[in-house]
């Protein structure tokens, strides 16, 4: 899935994210998407992806997704971009015990004249994030969702995980 956000405002009349999604056959939404992934074992995992979540903190870049997790719809994964910063936090839903993952992903925008001109700090750990879901673990287990900042490492973990079955 791909969330566009405001990329069309920076790239002229068309949205490059929409073009990439079409080329890859990926789900494309303009600002948000909530997905429920259904696994053969019966596990259901909910993903809440937005260009950004309301709320910010100078101390915690993951504040917006964390706020949505604690006050919102109780999904398993909350992921947003917008400010091109990386952050991650795991929370436990006190009502039903599920582990909720709040993620901010930077981007592949390496050369950012706009950020440099305005003095924005480089808070990008990685240009991407990959979540690998182990549907065999209970939704209360924090490792049901594993977060990786390197796609190759995520692929190796997924291969290892599948080999255990």
What residue ranges belong to the model's regions?
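Core catalytic region of metal-dependent phosphoesterases/phosphodiesterases
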Residues: 1-30
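Short, structured patches in soluble enzyme cores that scaffold and shape functional sites
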Residues: 2-4, 39, 49-53
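Residues that cap or initiate secondary-structure elements
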Residues: 8, 41-43, 137
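Extended low-complexity acidic/polar segments
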Residues: 22-30, 34-38, 71-78
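Short acidic-hydrophobic surface loop/beta-edge motif
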Residues: 31-42, 89-96
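MPN/JAMM (Mov34/JAB) isopeptidase/deubiquitinase module and associated MPN-bearing subunits/adaptors
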Residues: 138-165
């Amino acid at each position: 899935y791909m969330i566009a956000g405001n990329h069309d405002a920076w790239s002229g009349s068309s949205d490059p994210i929409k073009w990439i999604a079409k080329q890859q056959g990926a789900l494309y939404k303009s600002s948000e998407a909530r997905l429920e992934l259904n696994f053969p074992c019966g596990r259901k995992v909910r993903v809440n992806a937005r260009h950004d979540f309301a709320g910010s903190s100078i101390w915690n870049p993951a504040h917006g997704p964390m706020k949505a997790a604690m006050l919102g719809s109780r999904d398993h994964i909350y992921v947003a971009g917008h400010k091109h910063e990386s952050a991650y936090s795991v929370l436990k839903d006190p009502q039903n015990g599920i582990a909720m993952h709040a993620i901010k992903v930077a981007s592949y925008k390496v050369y950012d004249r706009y950020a440099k001109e305005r003095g924005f700090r480089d808070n990008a750990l990685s240009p991407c994030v990959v979540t690998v879901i182990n549907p065999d673990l209970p939704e209360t287990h924090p490792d049901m969702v594993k977060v990786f900042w390197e796609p190759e490492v995520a692929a190796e973990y997924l291969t290892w995980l599948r080999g255990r079955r």
